[in-house]
Each structure stands twice: as structure tokens, then as C-alpha cells.
């Protein structure tokens, strides 16, 4: 499927194809990738479309090669991306740490599958910690965006490119295998963000420009301390300006569901059904996982009686919820370790049970 999907009307497409086409519309100039299920359609789409548009496409020899090619392209100010999944993203952690230190605007699409290790190709959210905390060395953070619909695969791909270049920071679009393979109607439209001028720092050729050096090495402890202070001031700004979430029926809620990605779809349906039953249930869906909407959750903990985290893992986002709630009210976990998310019926039954306590 290499044809460019139309910008002007609604079309039915997979999450992976939606991401790839949105990246093309966003102006992605370079794609470097290595195939792995369940995200291989992204590379498939790019292999045809990027060459058709005379942009750079490389099917790399490994995941390590592909992410380091992205670093090289981004150091010139280019819009560059790669895509991968779980065990393969693990191989990219060193490069992500360097990208954070070098302040390079890389975009990584991570479509999660079962793990740890090779695992399997079923949907999972087991890489929440890997994305939000980081698997490389040092005190760095990445921007992490989490779509829950195929339309959001489009919208957040656009935002990923914009935020990566606006803040010169590695940015991850974190989806799961279910969303990558799901088909829904979407509208692409035009790229909605202003272009960011990367000319002041990029290695754009030596002719007629000042000398520039991009490096992660700091020769002294004092130099590294100052750099880290600068880096974390940027992270603080990102938290203040870019934290995003969807919130429904929380004003009077006794129980608040917190969920991201594909499980949030079932959580939303369950919340609506419980409202029809007279149960005071609300929902908060983080759209940015990093920065996490901790302040808003802390505010809701002043009025809610309980939170339930709905995830496809053994309980990872729940730790961030507990930190935000800070012991004010209980935080419970409803999960599946891997595979399909908890069903609407399971969520409703859990809400009923927790309402009786």
C-alpha cells in the first residue's frame, strides 16, 4: 500500500498506514527502518512513497543502524524518523540517550508487542517504562505521545514532528499492536503546525556559517552539571506547555478510570455504561505519557474516592498515578499482561465491585 492517502476526504486505513502517511504529510525527509511485526507496514509504505517523492529511504541492516542513521540526519536539521517495536526498541536505547544529550529532534514510532525479550506479536503496553523513564544512561527525558484511535495516530504523528523540532528533543509515538493493525476512518488534512527553523544549530554544511559542534561529552563535572540544569529546565517547560489529556465526567466522579492507548477505548465505553446505571464514574486518558498529567490527577484525588488504572501489562502507569495521588485515595489495577485489553464487561464488573467496598 504505497499510494499516498488523500488529504481531502475521510478514508478507511490501518493505524500503521495512518502513521506513515501522516509522517509524509508532516514533511518527513528521511526514513530509516528495519522490519519487525507489528509495525512493518510503516516501513512498507515508506519504501514506496519516500522514493516516489525523492526523499531518503533506507532499509537498514539492523535496528542499531537505523536509529543511528536517524541521529545523523537529524543533526543536519532534517525531519527524520524510524519505527520499531519493543525488543527492537531495546536495541536503540544507547542512541536515544545520545539523542537526548545532543538535543536532536528524532521521531521514533514504537508499536508495542509482548515481552520481555523476544516475547510475541500480541498487543502489549509493556514498554511504558521503557518510553517514559528511558532505557539509556543518564538523566534525560523523552516526549511520549499515546494515540488511542487511528485518527489520533495521524494527529499525534503531526504533533510528534512539531514537538521534536520545537524542543530539540527525542519524541516517541507510543502505540500498541492492536492500534497499529486496527482499521478506522480518518481524515489527514494539512500539516497543522508551523515549521520550526532549525538553521541556528544544525550541521548544514560549513560554508558561510559559524563553526558548530553537536556532542554529548562534557569534559568536567561542572560542565555536565550546567548542561543537565539546562536540559531539565527544558523538560520543565515542556511539562508546563505540552502536558495533554482527555477528561470525561470527573466533576462528580467517585471512581476515575485512568487508561491510555487501545485499553482507553474500552474504559470509555465502560464508563458511559456505568453512568447509565447511576454509578458516578469518570475517566482521564493521558495523551502525553511524558510529561504525565500528574498535577491534574493530584487535583482529582481531592474529590474522587478511588482510581483504577486499566493497562495491558503487569502494572506500569499505575506507579505514576500512585505518585500523583500521593496516598490520598486507593489506586487499583485492572490489567491483562498481554493480548487484548480488559473488556468493557470486565471493567464494568470491577467498577461495580469497587463501588460496593
Regions found by a protein language model. Give the residues of each.
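Redox- and metal-dependent alpha/beta enzyme cores, enriched for Fe-S-associated oxidoreductases
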Residues: 247-284, 290-296
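Peripheral docking tails and interdomain loops at the edges
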Residues: 311-357
Amino acid at each position: 500500500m504505497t499510494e499516498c492517502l488523500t488529504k481531502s476526504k475521510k478514508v478507511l486505513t490501518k493505524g500503521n498506514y495512518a502513521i506513515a502517511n501522516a509522517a509524509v504529510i508532516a514533511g518527513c525527509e528521511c526514513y530509516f527502518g528495519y522490519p519487525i511485526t507489528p509495525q512493518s507496514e510503516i516501513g512498507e509504505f515508506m519504501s514506496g512513497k519516500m522514493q516516489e517523492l525523492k526523499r531518503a529511504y533506507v532499509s537498514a541492516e539492523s535496528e542499531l543502524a537505523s536509529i543511528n542513521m536517524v541521529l545523523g540526519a537529524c543533526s543536519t536539521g532534517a525531519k527524520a524518523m524510524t519505527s520499531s517495536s519493543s525488543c527492537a526498541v531495546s536495541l536503540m536505547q544507547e542512541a536515544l540517550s545520545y539523542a537526548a544529550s545532543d538535543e536532536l529532534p528524532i521521531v521514533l514510532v514504537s508499536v508495542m508487542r509482548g515481552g520481555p525479550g523476544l516475547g510475541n506479536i500480541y498487543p502489549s503496553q509493556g514498554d511504558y517504562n521503557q518510553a517514559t523513564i528511558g532505557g539509556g544512561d543518564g538523566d534525560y527525558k523523552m516526549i511520549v505521545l499515546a494515540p488511542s484511535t487511528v485518527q489520533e495516530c495521524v494527529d499525534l504523528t503531526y504533533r510528534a514532528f512539531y514537538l521534536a523540532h520545537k524542543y530539540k528533543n527525542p519524541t516517541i509515538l507510543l502505540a500498541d499492536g492492536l492500534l497499529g493493525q486496527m482499521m478506522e476512518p480518518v481524515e489527514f488534512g494539512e500539516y497543522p503546525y508551523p515549521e520550526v527553523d532549525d538553521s541556528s544549530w544544525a550541521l548544514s554544511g560549513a560554508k558561510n556559517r559559524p563553526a558548530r559542534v553537536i556532542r554529548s561529552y562534557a569534559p568536567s563535572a561542572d560542565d555536565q552539571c550546567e548542561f543537565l540544569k539546562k536540559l531539565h529546565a527544558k523538560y520543565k517547560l515542556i511539562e508546563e506547555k505540552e502536558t495533554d489529556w482527555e477528561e470525561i465526567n470527573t466533576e462528580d466522579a467517585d471512581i476515575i478510570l485512568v487508561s491510555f492507548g487501545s485499553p482507553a477505548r474500552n474504559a470509555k465505553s465502560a464508563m458511559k455504561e456505568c453512568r447509565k446505571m447511576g454509578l458516578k464514574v469518570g475517566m482521564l486518558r493521558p495523551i502525553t505519557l511524558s510529561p504525565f498529567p500528574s498535577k491534574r490527577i493530584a487535583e482529582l484525588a481531592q474529590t474522587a474516592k478511588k482510581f483504577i488504572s486499566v493497562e495491558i501489562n503487569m502494572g506500569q502507569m499505575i506507579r505514576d498515578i500512585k505518585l500523583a495521588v500521593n496516598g490520598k485515595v486507593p489506586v487499583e489495577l485492572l490489567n491483562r499482561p498481554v493480548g487484548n485489553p480488559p473488556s468493557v464487561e470486565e471493567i464494568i464488573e470491577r467498577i461495580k465491585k469497587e463501588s460496593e467496598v
